[in-house]
C-alpha cells in the first residue's frame, strides 16, 4: 500500500486551500493508482460500517430492534453537526463495531436467552450511534476530497446488503441448521468473523490512505476572518435541494420495504419462503448494482447517470408511483399482481432507484452550491445530507405502520367445516 503517504499529502493539499470547489476530475493531481486506493478505502468503510447491522437482520435477530438502530443513526448524525468529531476517531469507531461483533458471538454462546436479548437491544442502539458517526466522518472526508469520494462511500453501503445476503445463502448450504435462542449458531459465528475481517481491512486502509489529522488547524485559527463560515441557515438554503432528495428517497424506500413488499404481499398471496428470499434478494442486488454507474460517468454509456438536483427532485416525485404499485400487489387478487416475476420487477425497480438516487446527491451537490465554497462549509452540508438520509430512514420505518390502518391484506379463504360425524 505504497500510495498511502502520497494520498495523504494530496488530501492535505486540498485541505490547505482557502476556498474549496469540486469541479470533477479535471485538473486532478491524483494518479490513477491513488484514485483507486482511495475509492477502495471508502468502499470498505461503507461496506464494513453496515455489515454489522445487515448481519443482525440477515440472522433475523429481533427485527423490532431495527427502530432503535435507526434512532441511534439519527442522534449520532445530529450530534456530529454541532460537535466536531475528530477525523482520527474514524478507525476507533470502526474498531468499536468489531468489538460489537465479538459481543454478539460471546453473548450468543455463553449468555442466557434473556441476557442475549438484552445485549441485542443495547448493541443495536450502539451500532446506530457508532456507525452513524463513522459514516458521517467518512462522508465529510470523501465529499471534500479533490476527487469526490462520496459516491464510493454510498457504493460500499450498497455492497453490504448483497454481500451479507450472498454469504448467508452460501452458509445455508454448508453449516448445521442448529439454532440457539432462535438464531443459527454456526451462521452467527461465521458471519461476524467475516464482519470483523472487513472492519480490520477498513481500519488498515483508513490509516494508510487517509490523512486523519488536522494539520491546518493552527493556520485556520490564525486566519479566522478568512475561515468564517456561512450560518447553518444560509448553508441549508444553499443545499436544500440535495437535502430534500436524500430525505425523499430514503423515506419512500423504507416505508415500502419490507413492510408492504414483501411482508404484506406474503400475507395476501401466501408467498413461499423461497420466493420471499428471491424478492428480498432482488432488492439487495439491484440496490448494489445501481450505486456504481453514477461513479463511472467518465465511461460513455454511464454519462447520463448523473444529472442536476432539479431533475432528481422530479424523478423522486415520479417515484411516489411505487406506493399504489406496492399496495395493488398486496390487495388485488389477480394473476398479474400475484405473479412472482412482476413482484420481482417491482422490487428491483424500487431498489435500483434507491441506490441510484442515494448516490447522485453526494456527487453533484458541490457543483450546484452558489454560496458555500470553503472546505468546512462543504463538510457541514455533507453532514446535512447524512442527517437527511438517516431521518428519511427513521420516518420511513415509522410511517410504514400507516398501512396497518387500512385493510390492504387479502382475507384468508374460509376453510370448509369439518364433518365430525364421520
Swiss-Prot record:
Cytoplasmic topological intervals: 1-38, 83-87, 140-149, 209-241, 295-309, 363-374
Intervals, Extracellular compartment: 60-63, 108-116, 175-185, 266-274, 331-338, 398-422
Coiled coil: none
Effect of residue 49 to A: Abolishes inosine binding
TM annotation in the entry: 39-59, 64-82, 88-107, 117-139, 150-174, 186-208, 242-265, 275-294, 310-330, 339-362, 375-397
InterPro entries assigned: Eqnu_transpt, MFS_trans_sf
Effect seen on changing residue 137 to C: No significant growth defects in adenosine-dependent proliferation assay when transporter expressed in purine auxotrophic yeast strain
KW rRNA processing (keyword) present: no
Protein name: Nucleoside transporter 1
Species the sequence originates in: Plasmodium falciparum (isolate 3D7)
Lineage, top ranks: Eukaryota, Sar, Alveolata, Apicomplexa, Aconoidasida
Amino acid at each position: 500500500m505504497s500510495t498511502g503517504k502520497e494520498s495523504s499529502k494530496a488530501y492535505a493539499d486540498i485541505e490547505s486551500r482557502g476556498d474549496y470547489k469540486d469541479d470533477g476530475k479535471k485538473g486532478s493531481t491524483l494518479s490513477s493508482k491513488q484514485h483507486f486506493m482511495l475509492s477502495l478505502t471508502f468502499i470498505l468503510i461503507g461496506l464494513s460500517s453496515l455489515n454489522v447491522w445487515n448481519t443482525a437482520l440477515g440472522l433475523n435477530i429481533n427485527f423490532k430492534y431495527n427502530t432503535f438502530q435507526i434512532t441511534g443513526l439519527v442522534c449520532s448524525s445530529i450530534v456530529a453537526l454541532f460537535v466536531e468529531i475528530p477525523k482520527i476517531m474514524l478507525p476507533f469507531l470502526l474498531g468499536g463495531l468489531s468489538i460489537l461483533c465479538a459481543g454478539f458471538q460471546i453473548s450468543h454462546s455463553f449468555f442466557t436467552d434473556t441476557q442475549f436479548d438484552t445485549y441485542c437491544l443495547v448493541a443495536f442502539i450502539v451500532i446506530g450511534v457508532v456507525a452513524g458517526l463513522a459514516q458521517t466522518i467518512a462522508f465529510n472526508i470523501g465529499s471534500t476530497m479533490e476527487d469526490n469520494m462520496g459516491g464510493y462511500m454510498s457504493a460500499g453501503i450498497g455492497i453490504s446488503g448483497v454481500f451479507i445476503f450472498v454469504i448467508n445463502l452460501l452458509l445455508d448450504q454448508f453449516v448445521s441448521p442448529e439454532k440457539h435462542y432462535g438464531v443459527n449458531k454456526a451462521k452467527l459465528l461465521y458471519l461476524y468473523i467475516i464482519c470483523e475481517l472487513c472492519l480490520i481491512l477498513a481500519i488498515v486502509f483508513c490509516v494508510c490512505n487517509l490523512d486523519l489529522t488536522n494539520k491546518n488547524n493552527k493556520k485556520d485559527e490564525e486566519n479566522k476572518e478568512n475561515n468564517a463560515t456561512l450560518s447553518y441557515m444560509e448553508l441549508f438554503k444553499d443545499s436544500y435541494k440535495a437535502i430534500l432528495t436524500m430525505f425523499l428517497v430514503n423515506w419512500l424506500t423504507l416505508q415500502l420495504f419490507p413492510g408492504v413488499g414483501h411482508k404484506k404481499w406474503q400475507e395476501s398471496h401466501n408467498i413461499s419462503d423461497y420466493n420471499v428470499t428471491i424478492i428480498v434478494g432482488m432488492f439487495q442486488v439491484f440496490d448494489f448494482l445501481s450505486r456504481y454507474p453514477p461513479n463511472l460517468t467518465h465511461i460513455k454509456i454511464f454519462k447520463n447517470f448523473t444529472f442536476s438536483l432539479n431533475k432528481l427532485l422530479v424523478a423522486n416525485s415520479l417515484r411516489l408511483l411505487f406506493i399504489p404499485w406496492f399496495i395493488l400487489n398486496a390487495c388485488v387478487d389477480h394473476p398479474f399482481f400475484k405473479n412472482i416475476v412482476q413482484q420481482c420487477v417491482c422490487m428491483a425497480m424500487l431498489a435500483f432507484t434507491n441506490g441510484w438516487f442515494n448516490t447522485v446527491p453526494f456527487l453533484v451537490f458541490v457543483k450546484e452550491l452558489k454560496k458555500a465554497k470553503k472546505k468546512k462549509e462543504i463538510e457541514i452540508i455533507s453532514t446535512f445530507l447524512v442527517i437527511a438520509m438517516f431521518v428519511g430512514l427513521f420516518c420511513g420505518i415509522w410511517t410504514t405502520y400507516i398501512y396497518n390502518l387500512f385493510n390492504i391484506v387479502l382475507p384468508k379463504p374460509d376453510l370448509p367445516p369439518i364433518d365430525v360425524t364421520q
